[in-house]
Amino acid sequence: GRRPCCNECGICDRSLDPMCICEDLVPQCHEGCQACEKVDTGTPMYQCRSFEYYHCGPICY
């Protein structure tokens, strides 16, 4: 399937096709996120805390 976009990838593993933790705060976690955490910033936002495959980069739509 299509990989979810991540503007700011944090820690990534060192494999050839790296899995990363996405630092983005989003209105809802992408389908397939295994560890979705609610982050309260005044409005409820979510962050996926599991290592997943992403398209990383600042211009990702």
Swiss-Prot record:
Site described as Reactive bond for trypsin, located at R14, S15
Disulfide bridges in this chain = C5-C60, C6-C22, C9-C56, C12-C20, C29-C36, C33-C48
Record's superkingdom?
A: Eukaryota
GO cellular component terms attached to this protein's record: extracellular region
The entry's note on the tissues where this protein occurs is:
Expressed in bulb (at protein level).
Looking up InterPro entries in the UniProt record yields: Bowman-Birk_prot_inh, Prot_inh_BBI
A biological process (GO) of this protein is: negative regulation of endopeptidase activity
Listed GO MF terms: serine-type endopeptidase inhibitor activity
Record key words, sorted:
Disulfide bond, Protease inhibitor, Serine protease inhibitor
Which family is this sequence assigned to? Belongs to the Bowman-Birk serine protease inhibitor family.
> What function is annotated for this protein?
Serine protease inhibitor. Inhibits trypsin (Ki = 30 nM) and weakly inhibits chymotrypsin (Ki = 550 nM). Does not inhibit bacterial subtilisin.
Q: What is this protein called?
A: Bowman-Birk type proteinase inhibitor B6
Species of origin: Hyacinthus orientalis
Give the organism's phylogenetic lineage.
Eukaryota, Viridiplantae, Streptophyta, Embryophyta, Tracheophyta
